[in-house]
Design a protein with these regions (language model features):
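A structural micro-motif at secondary-structure boundaries
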Residues: 134-135, 140
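An extended, acidic
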Residues: 140-254
Length: 254
């Protein structure tokens, strides 16, 4: 399987970040609280610096938007989107539900993504028109088409719980076959691999999810916000499904 130069760069950057994360994981790293009240560690910063150096060296004309080191040329036609440690709280509490997320957005559309979870042992990637893969195996979403047969996973849903859709979400939960809360990278990997059928989140930012947009869609799924709108830099919620269930879930939440 031949990769584009951009995907090779993203994979190399993810590998470098994984090496750094492994050296610092379960090492009692110092934690600082940022202005937005989220934690940051040495691992977050070092991983992003390493990723940024690789991507900017190979593609100096591309823009960059990172969780820790900020943005450069954010209006560029091609824009890297990077969360070096998505799941910093998991990293700090020493359980393996953290990952590195690297995506490339071109003219407003996500064209490739790499989702690397070194402590969990999963590496997933996708590029437009080339399919999605997990640990070298081609991914495909499920063919489940009925809610009463579907497995639904929810992640960050705090604002959903405080809004008018909460009652509708509860009714949806009662209709599906199985409800879980895998969260973070894992439920997107599972969705792309046909292990679950839908994912709902109401509190995300684009850096959390951009790579998984590419992975889910290249596996045959559909990825929008909770209103059904396409993913943009401003997206804060997620409905991701195998595609067959998308309209039904949107209708249930409307």
């Amino acid at each position: 399987m031949e990769h584009s130069a951009e995907l090779r760069a993203a994979l190399d950057a993810a590998e470098q970040a994984a090496a750094i994360a492994r050296t610092l994981y379960q090492r009692n790293v110092e934690v600082r609280i940022k202005a937005d009240k989220t934690p940051v560690t040495e691992a977050d910063v070092r991983c992003e610096i390493a990723i940024r150096e690789i991507l900017e060296a190979r593609f100096p004309a591309y823009g960059f938007c990172g969780e820790e080191t900020g943005s450069r040329d954010a209006q560029a036609e091609s824009l890297w989107l990077v969360d070096p440690i998505d799941g910093t709280k998991a990293f700090v509490r020493e359980y393996p539900m953290f990952s590195t997320q690297i995506a490339l957005m071109r003219r407003g559309e996500i064209v490739l993504g790499v989702s690397s979870a070194p402590a969990y042992g999963e590496l997933s990637f996708a590029e437009r028109g080339c399919g999605a893969y997990l640990n070298g195996k081609r991914l495909a979403v499920s063919e489940i088409a009925a809610l009463d047969a579907a497995a639904l996973s929810s992640g960050n849903i705090k604002s959903l719980a405080a809004g008018k859709q909460w009652t509708r979400y509860g009714a949806l939960v009662a209709r599906v076959n199985r409800i879980r809360g895998y969260g973070d990278f894992l439920h997107y990997h599972l969705l792309a691999g046909g292990k679950i059928d839908a994912v709902i989140e109401s509190d995300v930012n684009i850096l959390d999810i951009a790579a998984c947009v590419a992975i889910v869609t290249e596996a045959g799924g559909r990825f929008t916000d909770l209103s059904g709108a396409p993913v943009t830099l401003q997206t804060t919620s997620v409905l991701a499904t195998n595609g067959r269930l998308h309209a039904q879930v949107l209708a249930a939440l409307a």
